[in-house]
């Protein structure tokens, strides 16, 4: 069976977060994921957190590509006592980073997790919801495929309503990012059902008061929405007045398996420069109904040509690998390295391969 699903990456104040990864057997989607990460000039070893929205095989399977990350998943997925419980074990919301929360949103499975990304100036609050929503069409249906395949459709409906009433945009499990419309909010009966929940939960810092006026903002074209963000009340688009400009971008391609099967890689960058309409050459298809594109990555003007690598480990690579290893608080001396995972050696090997590929291409 060929399974594909959305893979997301969030950058928040020095933290790289990957949400879901392709199936272990989906080689094409794995390559797309790694290409998407590389497009941000980072390597998998720099990812600090990996969140699995639920335990179905099309949403996890490539976690081994992130050896330095902390992994978050439902407690039912792993029952080994060596795993550490988090706030989500006793609470509905866990603060992962300054602008990112993990929400308990059971429904599709008993252990669904939704990643709430706050203060994205182009889009307000973005919910990375896994299969709680399959796609935009599914979000408008009272009893669609989500209802038929849900672990508990009644609980699932409650979780979906929570997300609809709180977020401005949703990245679904199998489709393009879409905005939450006023029609969706009306169908979820937001004011009567969800405002009380927010008041009772002290962890949630935002409120649904923006709902009266958000529609006039999100109906604008994406470029207008972003460029006019400074003139809009930040209370209802979810951005503080001092926040940096942000961007959300999508990389979408059709897999070799089927003309109708797509895998989507989204990046929500909370510290990006003001987006332009330009994008890197890995954007293949239409960007209709998406927020503004991020800035194309430019080569640093102070870039220094390094000598070609010869031998197993070039001294410059070895030196840089040690600095990277130190930043990641990995062991430095040989005795510690022999006892623990050899992250330093992996960095040396990875950097050597990357540099040789660069030299061959240029």
From Swiss-Prot:
Q: Which SMART domains match?
A: Lactamase_B
Instruction: Give the source's domain of life in one word.
Output: Eukaryota
Under InterPro entries, the record lists: MBLAC1 (IPR039344), Metallo-B-lactamas (IPR001279), RibonucZ/Hydroxyglut_hydro (IPR036866)
- Disulfide-linked positions: none
Q: Which CDD domains does UniProt cross-reference here?
A: MBLAC1-like_MBL-fold
- What is the protein name stated in its UniProt record? Uncharacterized protein C03F11.2
What organism does this protein naturally occur in?
Answer: Caenorhabditis elegans
């Amino acid at each position: 069976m060929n399974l594909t699903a959305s893979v997301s990456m969030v950058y928040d104040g020095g933290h790289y977060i990957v949400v879901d990864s392709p199936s272990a057997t989906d080689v094409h989607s794995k390559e797309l994921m790694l290409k998407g990460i590389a497009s941000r000039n980072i390597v998998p070893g720099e990812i600090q957190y990996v969140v699995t929205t639920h335990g179905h095989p099309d949403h996890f399977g490539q976690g081994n590509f992130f050896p330095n990350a902390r992994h978050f998943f439902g407690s039912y997925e792993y029952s080994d006592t060596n795993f550490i419980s988090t706030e989500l074990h006793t609470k509905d919301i866990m603060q992962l980073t300054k602008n990112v929360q993990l929400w308990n949103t059971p429904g599709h499975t008993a252990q669904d997790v939704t990643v709430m990304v706050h203060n994205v100036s182009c889009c307000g609050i973005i919910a990375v919801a896994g299969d709680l929503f399959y796609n935009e069409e599914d979000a408008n249906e009272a009893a669609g495929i989500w209802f038929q395949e849900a672990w508990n459709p009644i609980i699932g409906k409650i979780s979906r309503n929570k997300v609809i009433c709180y977020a401005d945009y949703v990245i679904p499990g199998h489709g393009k990012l879409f905005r939450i419309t006023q029609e969706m909010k009306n169908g979820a009966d937001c004011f009567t059902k969800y405002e009380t929940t927010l008041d009772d939960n002290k962890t949630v810092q935002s409120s649904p008061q923006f709902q009266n006026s958000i529609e006039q903002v999100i109906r604008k074209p994406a470029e207008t929405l972003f460029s006019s963000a400074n003139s809009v009340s930040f209370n209802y688009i979810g951005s503080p007045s001092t926040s940096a400009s942000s961007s959300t971008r999508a990389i979408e391609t059709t897999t070799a398996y089927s003309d109708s099967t797509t895998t989507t890689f989204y990046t929500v960058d909370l510290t990006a420069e003001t987006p332009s309409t330009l994008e890197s050459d890995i954007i293949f298809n239409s960007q209709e109904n998406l927020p503004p594109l991020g800035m194309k990555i430019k080569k640093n003007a102070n870039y220094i040509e390094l000598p070609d690598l010869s031998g197993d480990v070039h001294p410059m690579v070895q030196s840089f690998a040690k600095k990277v290893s130190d930043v990641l608080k990995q062991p430095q001396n040989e005795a510690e390295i022999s006892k623990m995972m050899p992250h330093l050696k992996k960095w040396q090997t990875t950097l050597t391969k990357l540099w040789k590929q660069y030299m061959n291409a240029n």
